[in-house]
């Protein structure tokens, strides 16, 4: 899994932050040294309570989410998972333990992950634990991930998202959109026309796109769909909220990276081009970017065709 790569890098932490608009509240995820990330979370006010988009991975992140809900005096009436990666869905069980009536709106791609990706990742993680190289804190995190993988009922949707369309979630009108074969086999992204708010999940990741389960060209198409909405604020899966002009800049950087990967330019040139094009979204003290972009060039963008297209078809 991605943490096996990232925990080997010189990691720079980012402090969690919270902000929002009139009808929504943003809780920023974190990526602290020596552990995996938490994705961003967003609360939306709804007639029946609160809608929570993505639940993070770590107990500390979930404590912030629960504290906000309790401070508001409202139940979490619905969870929307943008995708099945555990830094976005790993807290489902904890949130639903506190709010057992919360429905889970999510895609069905987790079925393929449960059948193949999770078992394969678990095997690698078990070998890492057996090596004795994991710190006690990291070992505890890996075991929490195992527990999340085993709790199938918390990862699966009670309200599956199988196509794009307008729905009412906890009484609030939202557009739940399904992007096939992009950052994952099925990415759910949310557009709130009343707030002009777009919640992108890992279709947009500020510092560098995570291609671990990505289909590059499908992802490029999904970004065009995002651009078609008249949003004013976009919440990425990781990183700070963006205006539409900022998103367009990020989308250009994404396209340039794919285009560079398709040429015979040196890998270092493609890495440098990403760092230049996406400079506004990369923290100045983050030393992970060179290794991460190089890794994704080797493992996905310039991999042999079968590997490059591995996640451009169903995992099941």
Where are these regions (language model features)?
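Active-site metal-binding motif and surrounding structural segment of the metallo-beta-lactamase
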Residues: 60-106, 227-232
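Bacterial N-terminal signal peptides
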Residues: 4-12
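Boundary at the C-terminal end of the N-terminal hydrophobic targeting segment
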Residues: 12-21
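Divalent metal-coordination and catalytic microenvironments
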Residues: 44, 54, 69, 83, ...
């Amino acid at each position: 899994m991605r943490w096996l790569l990232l925990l080997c890098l010189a990691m720079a932490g980012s402090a969690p932050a919270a902000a929002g608009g009139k009808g929504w509240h943003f809780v920023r995820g974190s990526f602290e040294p020596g552990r995996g990330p938490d994705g961003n979370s967003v609360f939306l006010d709804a007639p029946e309570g609160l809608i929570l988009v993505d639940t993070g991975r770590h107990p500390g992140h979930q404590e912030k989410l629960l504290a906000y809900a309790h401070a508001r005096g409202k139940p979490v009436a619905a969870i929307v998972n943008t995708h099945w990666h555990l830094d976005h869905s790993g807290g489902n069980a904890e949130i639903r333990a506190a709010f057992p009536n919360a429905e889970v709106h999510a895609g069905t791609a987790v079925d393929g992950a449960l059948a193949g990706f999770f078992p394969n990742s678990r095997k690698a993680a078990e070998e890492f634990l057996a090596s004795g190289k994991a710190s006690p804190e990291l070992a505890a995190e890996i075991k929490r991930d195992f527990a999340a993988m085993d709790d199938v009922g918390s990862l699966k949707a009670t309200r599956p998202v199988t196509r794009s369309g307008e729905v009412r979630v906890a009484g609030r009108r939202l557009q739940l959109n399904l992007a096939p074969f992009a950052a994952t086999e099925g990415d759910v992204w949310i557009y709130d026309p009343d707030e002009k708010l777009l919640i992108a999940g890992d279709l947009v990741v500020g510092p560098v796109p995570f291609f671990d389960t990505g289909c590059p060209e499908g992802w490029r198409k999904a970004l065009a769909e995002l651009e078609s909405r008249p949003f004013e604020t976009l919440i990425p899966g990781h990183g700070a909220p963006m205006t539409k002009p900022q998103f367009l800049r990020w989308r250009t950087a994404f396209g340039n990276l794919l285009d560079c990967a398709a040429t015979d330019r040196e890998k270092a040139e493609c890495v440098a081009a990403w760092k230049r094009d996406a400079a506004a979204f990369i923290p100045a003290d983050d030393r992970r970017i060179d290794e991460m972009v190089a890794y994704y060039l080797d493992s996905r963008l310039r991999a042999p065709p079968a590997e490059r297209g591995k996640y451009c078809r169903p995992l099941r």
